[in-house]
């Protein structure tokens, strides 16, 4: 299972085409929180994107996380000169634990992203309520802050 997750992330990294701005193309960075790890974002249109995370949890049992979300961005929500957007969207999460307590479930990501002017980065804060459905129903949260670099 770990090999499939790693191969999927590598495929994503090498398959995407770099771009010149944060509203299109591919960005790669880090996220600190629950879990902590690698964050990737691929823009599918000017206001929608695919978001991926590959991380490790340091809380309770050590565990590996993989998530994917389809995000919708709401620009110009705040009256400011800065490029700040609200984003939200559904996704899925796989948590792999050493003692066979692995879980699969849904998540709903909500966050804010700031794109500094004339830079190839974005800075984000997000929280994601989780509803595990396999092997049993359980409710929890993920969240974190991060930064991504968008390739030219």
What is the predicted function of each stretch?
Residues 1-4:
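Positively charged n-region of N-terminal signal peptides that target proteins for export
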Residues 20-58, 65, 150:
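Short glycine/proline- and aromatic-enriched beta-strand/turn motifs that initiate or cap beta-hairpins
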Residues 14-18:
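N-terminal signal peptide c-region/cleavage motif recognized by signal peptidases
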Residues 24-26, 34-36, 48, 62-66, ...:
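Residues that define the transmembrane beta-barrel architecture of outer-membrane proteins
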Residues 30, 38-42, 54, 68-72, ...:
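Residues on the lipid-exposed face of transmembrane beta-strands in outer-membrane beta-barrel proteins
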Residues 20-25, 47, 75-84, 100, ...:
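Short loop/turn motifs that connect adjacent beta-strands in outer-membrane beta-barrel proteins
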Residues 35-37, 55-61, 75-77, 93-99, ...:
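Sequence/structural signature of outer-membrane beta-barrel proteins
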Residues 61-63, 117-152:
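Predominantly the C-terminal beta-signal and adjacent terminal strand-loop region
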């Amino acid at each position: 299972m770990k090999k499939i997750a790693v191969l999927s992330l590598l495929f994503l990294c090498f398959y995407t085409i770099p771009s010149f701005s944060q509203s299109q193309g591919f960005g790669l960075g880090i996220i600190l929180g629950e879990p902590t790890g690698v964050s990737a974002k691929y823009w599918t249109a000017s206001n929608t994107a695919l978001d991926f995370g590959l991380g490790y949890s340091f809380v309770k049992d050590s565990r590996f996380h993989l998530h994917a979300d389809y995000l919708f961005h709401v620009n110009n929500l705040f009256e400011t000169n800065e490029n700040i957007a609200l984003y939200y969207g559904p996704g899925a999460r796989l948590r792999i634990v050493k003692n066979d307590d692995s879980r699969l479930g849904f998540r709903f990501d909500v966050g804010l992203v700031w794109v500094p002017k004339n830079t190839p980065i974005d800075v984000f804060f997000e929280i994601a309520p989780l509803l595990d459905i396999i092997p049993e129903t359980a409710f929890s949260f993920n969240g974190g802050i991060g930064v991504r670099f968008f390739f030219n």
